């Protein structure tokens, strides 16, 4: 697809019903984790995790918590805006959905945490 260049920058939010949100300047979009039922990483809405890679919102780019934290940390520690390219493609690139060993890539509907969240690395 046709790529559009944008920038992520320090206007960030560690919590707002998602983890590690970073604003994409020049758009109304944020890059952030899947949705939670509040400001706790133990209140994940499992269906939003299982829906990663599908079109669920009109503006935001949702990624697994581990990738959201990586992007957040890069944006927060960088002095300047960081260029990114957003485009539609079947190639998921480095931020494609990670399927953990011995899993289907989906989580049970009653699971309340993201298995890629660094806070839960011992539960993997």
Q: Predicted segments — roles?
A:
Residues 3-124:
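Exported/periplasmic cell-wall-interacting domains
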């Amino acid at each position: 697809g046709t790529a559009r260049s944008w920038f992520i920058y320090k206007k960030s939010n560690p919590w707002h019903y998602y983890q590690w949100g970073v604003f994409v300047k020049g758009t109304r979009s944020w890059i952030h984790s899947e949705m939670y039922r509040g400001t706790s990483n133990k209140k994940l809405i499992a269906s939003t995790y299982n829906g990663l890679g599908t079109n669920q919102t009109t503006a935001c780019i949702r990624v697994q918590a581990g990738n959201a934290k990586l992007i957040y940390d890069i944006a927060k520690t960088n002095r300047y805006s960081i260029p990114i390219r957003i485009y539609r493609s079947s190639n998921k690139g480095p931020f494609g959905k990670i399927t953990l060993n011995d899993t289907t890539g989906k989580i049970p509907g009653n699971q309340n945490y993201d298995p890629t969240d660094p806070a839960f690395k011992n539960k993997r």
